């Protein structure tokens, strides 16, 4: 659903942020 989609997007952004940190 929408919540799981948002969770996937947030997880992806978090991964990118960690990679950039």
From Swiss-Prot:
Q: Which UniProt keywords apply?
A: Amidation, Amphibian defense peptide, Antimicrobial, Secreted
Localized where? Secreted
GO annotations of cellular component type: extracellular region
Coiled-coil region(s): none
Tagged with keyword Secreted: yes
Q: Biological process GO terms, please? A: defense response
Is Secreted one of the keywords?
Answer: yes
- Expressed in which tissues: Expressed by the skin glands.
Alanine amide PTM positions? 21
Q: What this chain does, per the record?
A: Antimicrobial peptide.
Q: Which family does it belong to?
A: Belongs to the gastrin/cholecystokinin family. Magainin subfamily.
What is the name attached to this protein's record?
Answer: Peptide PGLa-BM2
Source species: Xenopus boumbaensis (Mawa clawed frog)
The lineage is: Eukaryota, Metazoa, Chordata, Craniata, Vertebrata
